[in-house]
Regions:
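Beta-propeller domains
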Residues: 172-293
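Blade-loop segments of beta-propeller domains
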Residues: 48-118
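Short glycine/acidic-enriched loop and turn motifs that connect beta-strands
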Residues: 27-30, 83-86, 130-134, 184-188, ...
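Short loop/turn segments immediately following beta-strands, especially the blade-tip
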Residues: 38-47, 89-98, 145-148, 196-205, ...
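Asp-box/WD-like beta-propeller blade repeats and closely related beta-sheet repeat scaffolds
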Residues: 94-173, 182-184, 210
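Repeated scaffold domains used in trafficking and secretory/extracellular systems
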Residues: 61-69, 108-116, 162-170, 219-226, ...
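Residue-level detector of Asp-centered blade-edge/turn motifs that repeat once per structural unit
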Residues: 15-17, 71-74, 118-121, 172-175, ...
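Beta-propeller fold detector
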Residues: 47-57, 97-106, 150-157, 204-212, ...
Length: 293
């Protein structure tokens, strides 16, 4: 995943880029350790687009996967190696020369971390797909900015056998809500639900099944969501290429409604919201994502 950051005048020496792009990567063949790449993202720089530095983890070979979408205010980047159920934290006090400051594996039996997001208080909230074993339901874990465990909350619903694997995170500070999607990275089964949590207490408030559309299998595996400009409404897509709207989050019965079907293709991956526009990646018939809508 990618993080874009700006360097202040104090941070950036003369002739150094004013904007940087951090990219968390693994190599194509999974033969070398994951690494964080620093790229010149200053469009006015003569070296725009060039690689500035790379910082490997010097650890086991794995799968570099998610980071926060935006650089946290602490300047600490959480980055996960999903295959190894591991989290790395980079500090960016010197934006041009990040340093690996900490790493950890399982937390209180929670394993396979996926997404990270900065809460309004500066702490980091993360989805963990499982707890206690690969065929279990995970939950939310909250960390201090520097990676200390603070608290957690299970996604499993007592007495109900709903398949859940917490995946993406959307924060709605205006309404004191956290929304999580559910998609199993190990692909043991399909999920059809999103969950809504109280941001202050991490109490699980709602588990809502996506509405089924006749003749279209697009309600499988809620994937990534984005908060809209009103600060209250969420659009999210499914891995099976459906687009849905979630609103009335502060009501007793939040509402999910079908919006659009992107493609007949095998899957739809990460979206980007730019102002009032939704840009959606769509897979080719051969597997990789090679287009957008």
């Amino acid at each position: 995943l990618f993080l874009l950051t700006s360097c202040t005048q104090q941070d950036a020496p003369q002739n150094q880029p004013k904007e940087l792009l951090y990219v968390w990567l693994h190599d194509v063949g999974f033969e070398d350790p994951n690494f964080l790449a620093v790229i010149n993202a200053d469009s006015e720089s003569e070296n725009y687009g060039e690689l500035v530095d790379t910082v490997p983890v010097f650890d086991t070979v794995g799968m570099a996967h998610h980071t926060p979408i935006f650089l946290p205010s602490s300047g600490l980047i959480y980055a996960n190696d999903f295959h190894n159920s591991h989290t790395y934290i980079y500090e960016t006090n010197n934006p041009l020369k990040p340093k690996l400051s900490k790493s950890f594996g399982k937390i209180k039996e929670y394993s396979f971390p996926h997404s990270y997001s900065e809460l309004p208080n500066g702490n980091i909230i993360s989805t963990f797909q499982t707890k206690g074993g690969i065929n279990t339901v995970g939950g939310l874990v909250e960390f201090s900015p520097d990676g200390r465990y603070l608290r957690s909350s299970d996604a499993e619903i007592e007495g109900e056998s709903i398949f859940l694997r917490p995946y993406g995170i959307v924060l709605v500070p205006k309404l004191n809500r956290i929304i999580t999607t559910n998609y199993d990275m190990h692909e043991t089964d399909n999920s059809f639900h999103i969950q809504i949590w109280d941001m202050k207490t991490l109490e699980q408030l709602h588990t809502i099944k996506l509405p089924k559309n006749e003749d279209m299998i697009i309600d499988q595996n809620p994937f990534e969501g984005r908060l809209l400009s009103d600060g209250e409404t969420i659009l999210f897509q499914t891995f099976s290429c459906g687009l849905y709207m979630l609103n009335s989050l502060d009501q007793n019965m939040p509402k999910i409604s079908y919006v659009h079907h992107f493609a007949e293709g095998p899957f739809c991956s990460l979206p980007v919201r730019l102002g009032n526009y939704w840009i959606q990646t769509v897979a080719s018939d051969m597997g990789g994502c090679n287009g957008g809508v």
